[in-house]
């Protein structure tokens, strides 16, 4: 017989004969199970891409298809939750406020923004999921690039124009947008 420590409570449980130990799984509540599936799906899509088979994900999780579909009715629903978790949850409204701050010079804004931006987005799961999406269905990459185009790039173009002593009143040109998308592509390449 040996003494076993309950990992959840840290308390010692009754003595159990050594040969009668069986693996028991603690039943998770709904929130914990959904979080477990989502966290593992993020790792799974970062490793296998967006075309990874859900049957392999369920096998890795040790759950049935039925349970997976209880929380995420379709693969697309799961991918949308992955997008929200990996991309939307990391988006910082402070970036927009920083770029709009009239008290800072363009150089100060660029330095502060790109330092924080790269530290936030250049993670294994962010970069790999973005690249895998770009290589397959574009569902995530298109949404992320639209977010960049609508909320960041116009501000970055405005600050670049200020730095170059050019007019900041006209809409960004296609050429300017492409230039900044190329810059962001370079950042991901370095990452």
Segments and roles (model prediction):
Residues 57, 85, 129-133, 147, ...:
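Short acidic/histidine-centered micro-motifs embedded in hydrophobic/aromatic stretches
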Residues 1-32, 43, 64:
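N-terminal intrinsically disordered/low-complexity leader segments
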Residues 92, 119, 129-131, 139-166, ...:
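Amphipathic alpha-helical packing segments from all-alpha helical-bundle domains
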Residues 84, 107-132, 187-189:
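Helical hydrophobic small-molecule/effector-binding pocket
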Residues 36, 40, 44-85:
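Helix-turn-helix
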Residues 4, 169-191:
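Hydrophobic alpha-helical segments that form the core
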Residues 82-112:
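Amphipathic alpha-helical linker/stalk segments
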Residues 30, 34, 83, 110, ...:
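Amphipathic, non-transmembrane alpha-helical scaffold segments
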């Amino acid at each position: 017989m040996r003494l076993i420590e309950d990992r959840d409570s840290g308390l010692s449980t009754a003595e159990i004969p050594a040969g009668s130990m069986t693996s028991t799984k603690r039943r998770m509540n709904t929130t914990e199970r959904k979080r477990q599936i989502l966290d593992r799906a993020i790792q799974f899509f970062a490793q296998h891409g967006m075309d990874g088979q859900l049957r392999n994900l369920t096998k890795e999780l040790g759950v049935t298809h039925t349970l997976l579909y209880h929380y995420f009715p379709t693969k697309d629903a799961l991918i949308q939750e992955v997008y929200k978790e990996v991309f939307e949850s990391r988006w910082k409204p402070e970036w927009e406020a920083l770029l709009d701050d009239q008290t800072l010079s363009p150089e100060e804004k660029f330095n502060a923004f790109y330092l924080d931006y790269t530290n936030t987005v250049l993670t294994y799961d962010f970069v790999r999921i973005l690249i895998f999406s770009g290589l397959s269905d574009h569902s995530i990459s298109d949404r992320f690039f639209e977010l960049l185009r609508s909320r960041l790039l116009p501000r970055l173009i405005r600050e670049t124009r200020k730095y170059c002593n050019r007019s900041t009143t006209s809409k960004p040109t296609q050429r300017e947008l492409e230039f900044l998308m190329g810059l962001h592509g370079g950042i991901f390449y370095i990452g």
